[in-house]
């Protein structure tokens, strides 16, 4: 039985990506394209004895967006590729140089060679110190379902304030620094639900959360 299993050829490749569809940097199409590049002629028709599953795993894990990969054959000859993707939090768009994603652990993932993930973009005065703050803010946004749904862009203005540009058009939410982010989010959510729901979300162009225990709007 073991010998017969070794003779089993790869009849099909199934790729499973452990990530929400809108946040997939790695897709089945991309994995199959890479396999065609790494292995001349592809893997369909190759026998299990001729293929190092560990080699396939290492190659897939060399992709910057991949955290972990597990590869195995089932008894029907299907090559199963399970990919655990890094979690993109924000796309950094610097004034100079190439844009990239920041994933959990502040891991940089080049845009080249990945699919497009629907995460907030960050731009403006992006010094190294400010990028660290953008990462912290993005982490808090990602973990808050309301803020995650609201946030379109994170902008660093000329004074060094962090500003969230929401999907509500023509509005800015001034966060300021990364101190007391949970409190600022809580104030904003209450303001939207108890205030703007009655007068309209587009009533104010600027919502300033910088100041403790108050919201300044204009």
Language model features with spans:
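Short, well-structured beta-strand/strand-turn elements
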Residues: 61-77, 146
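Flexible glycine-/small-residue-rich
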Residues: 15-19, 83-87, 113, 123-126, ...
